[in-house]
Amino acid sequence: MPSQRSSLMQPIPEETRKTPSAAAEDTRWSRPECQAWTGILLLGTCLLYCARVTMPVCTVAMSQDFGWNKKEAGIVLSSFFWGYCLTQVVGGHLGDRIGGEKVILLSASAWGFITVTTPLLAHLGSGHLAFLTFSRILTGLLQGVYFPALTSLLSQKVQESERAFTYSTVGAGSQVGTLVTGGVGSVLLDQCGWQSVFYFSGGLTLLWAYYVYRYLLNEKDLVLALGFLAQGLPVTKPSKVPWRQLFRKASVWAAICSQLCSACSFFILLSWLPTFFKETFPNSKGWVFNVVPWMLAIPASLFSGFISDRLISQGYRVITVRKFMQVMGLGLSSIFALCLGHTTSFLKAMIFASASIGFQTFNHSGISVNIQDLAPSCAGFLFGVANTAGALAGVVGVCLSGYLIETTGSWTCVFHLVAIISNLGLGTFLVFGKAQRVDLVPTHEDL
C-alpha cells in the first residue's frame, strides 16, 4: 500500500494547471485541522439527520391533523428517497472536483431553508399531501450530495490508517441527530405542535452553515467553486479513471450491493420505528423510544471505528477487518430486528431496537470505508453510485413496509424484510468483498 501511494504522489508536470482549491485538496489535514473538521462534520451530520428525522417523528401527529392513512403516510416518508437517490452521483463527482466541504456547505444552507419553510407549505391550501411530498423530495435532493461529498473529502484529507475512526466519528452524528430530534423534538411536539420541530431543526442547520462559511472556508475558494459550477467548467484537469475496469470488478459490485442493503434496512427502521412504538405501545413516552436506541448507538459507532483502526494497526488484513465489521453491522443487527417483531414487552422491544440500531453503526467502519479502500481517487463518485442504489432500495423498502403494515396489520413482516435485505448484503460482501485498489492505471491523476 505505501508503494502504491508514493507512486500516486509523484510531482505533476508544470503544464498541468490546477486551481488553488484543487491544489489544497492534494494535501492532508494536520492533526489539529483533522480534529476541528471532524467535530464540525460530526455536527453537520447531526443536523442532517435532525432535518431528515423530523418528518418520521411528526408523522403520527401530522396524520391526525391531515387525515392520512398508512399508505399516504408512507408516500410522504418515502418521497424523501425519491429526491435522495437522484443527487448521490452528482454530489460525489462535485466533491471530487470542487471539494467536499463546499458541496456540504451549499447543500446544508438549502435544506435548512426548506426545513424551516415546510410548515408554511403544509398550510398553503388543501393539497397538503402534495406540498409536503414535494418538500420532502427537495430535502432529499439537497441531502443526497452530503455523504458522497463527505466520502470524497475524507478520502482526500485523512490518512488511510485514521479513516475508519474519523468516518465512524462523523457518522455518529446520524445517531446524535436522531437522538436530538427524538428527544427535544418529542418535547416540542407535545408542547408546541409539530411545526416547532421543523423550525428547530431547520434553524440550527442555517446557524451551522453560517458558522462554517464565516470561520472555516476560504471565501475566495467558495466563490471560485460557485463560478465554475455556474459556467459548467471542470475545476481540475479530467483524470483517467478506468471506469470500465472499475465496474468489471466483483469487489466493486459487492461493495455496491452491501451498501445498498445496509442503507435500505437502515432507512426502513429510521422511517417506521417511531410509528411502531407509538402504535404497539401507546402508553409509552415518545421521548424514550425516540432517544434510547440512538443514544446507545453513539458509543457503538465510536467503538467500531476505534477497534477497526486498532485491529489494522496490529497487523490484521484490511479486508478481514472490514468483513468482521459487516458481520456485526448487517448480520447481528438483523437478528435483533427479527426479535423486535416477536415481542410484546416494551422493555424487550427497547433492548432489541437499541441493539439493532447500535450494531448497524458498525457499517461505518466496514462497507463505508471499504469504498475508500477500493478507489480513493474517485471515492465520492463510487460512493454516490452505491448510495444511489441504497436510496432507490429505500424508496421501495419504506413504501413496501407501509403497504405490508396496512394490508396485514402486523409489524412482524416488516422486520422480516429488514433481516432478509441485511443478510443478502452480508453474504454478497463476505463472498466477493476485497480491499485492494481497483482505480490504478499507469498514468493516474487524482481527481
Curated annotation (Swiss-Prot):
Record's bilayer topology term: Multi-pass membrane protein
GO molecular function: ADP transmembrane transporter activity; ATP transmembrane transporter activity; guanine nucleotide transmembrane transporter activity; purine nucleotide uniporter activity
Biological process, per Gene Ontology: ADP transport; ATP export; ATP transport; guanine nucleotide transmembrane transport; lysosomal protein catabolic process; purine nucleotide import into lysosome
Principal location: membrane
Compartments, record wording: Cytoplasmic vesicle, Secretory vesicle, Chromaffin granule membrane; Cytoplasmic vesicle, Secretory vesicle membrane; Lysosome membrane
Region span, Disordered: 1-26
Tissue specificity annotation: In brain, specifically expressed in the medulla and is associated with chromaffin granules (at protein level). Predominantly expressed in adrenal gland, brain and thyroid.
Keyword Nuclease annotated: no
Activity regulation, free text: Activity is chloride-dependent.
Catalytic activity: ATP(in) = ATP(out); ADP(in) = ADP(out); GTP(in) = GTP(out)
A Gene Ontology cellular-component term: secretory granule
Entries under InterPro entries matching the protein: MFS (IPR011701), MFS_dom (IPR020846), MFS_Na/Anion_cotransporter (IPR050382), MFS_trans_sf (IPR036259), SLC17A9-like (IPR044777), Sugar_transporter_CS (IPR005829)
Keyword entries, A-Z: Cytoplasmic vesicle, Lysosome, Membrane, Transmembrane, Transmembrane helix, Transport
Pfam families linked to this entry: MFS_1
Transmembrane segments: 40-60, 74-94, 103-123, 129-149, 169-189, 192-212, 252-272, 287-307, 327-347, 380-400, 413-433
Entry function: Voltage-gated ATP nucleotide uniporter that can also transport the purine nucleotides ADP and GTP. Uses the membrane potential as the driving force to control ATP accumulation in lysosomes and secretory vesicles. By controlling ATP storage in lysosomes, regulates ATP-dependent proteins of these organelles. Also indirectly regulates the exocytosis of ATP through its import into lysosomes in astrocytes and secretory vesicles such as adrenal chromaffin granules, mucin granules and synaptic vesicles.
Record-linked PANTHER family: SOLUTE CARRIER FAMILY 17, VOLTAGE-GATED PURINE NUCLEOTIDE UNIPORTER SLC17A9
UniProt similarity note: Belongs to the major facilitator superfamily. Sodium/anion cotransporter family.
Stated name of the protein: Voltage-gated purine nucleotide uniporter SLC17A9
Organism in which the protein naturally occurs: Mus musculus (Mouse)
